[in-house]
């Protein structure tokens, strides 16, 4: 379940419950900005009830320390991505390669196939 942000989380949690009730094996909630304006109680309840397996959000906004302690919470580190964008701007070059990860994916696949750690 993907959305641009989690404010209270009501809509995403409702979708998670519905898809689990319809037979989904797992439910992952993914968002760019996790604000969690109503706290984590409802997320805790849904996790404990088995409606959500993970909540994944970027570290592009402040994340309360309590979020990092949740067993279902994963912070997607965007530091390197932001650094690449800033570097591209500072050198007046296109950010196309930053936005299109195809070359990086192919490079990782080649390393994987060759048994090279990455």
Residues of each region from the PLM?
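PRPP-associated nucleotide enzymes
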Residues: 1-118
């Amino acid at each position: 379940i993907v959305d641009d942000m989690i404010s209270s989380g009501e809509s995403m949690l409702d979708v998670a419950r519905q898809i689990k009730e319809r037979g989904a094996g797992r439910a992952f909630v993914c968002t760019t900005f996790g604000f969690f304006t109503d706290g984590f109680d409802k997320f805790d309840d849904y996790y404990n009830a088995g409606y959500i397996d993970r909540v994944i959000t970027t570290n592009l906004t402040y994340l309360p320390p309590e979020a990092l302690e949740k067993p279902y919470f994963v912070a997607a580190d965007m530091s390197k991505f932001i650094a690449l964008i800033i570097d591209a701007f500072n050198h007046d070059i296109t950010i196309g390669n930053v936005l299109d990860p195809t070359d990086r994916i192919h490079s990782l696949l080649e390393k994987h196939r060759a048994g090279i750690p990455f």
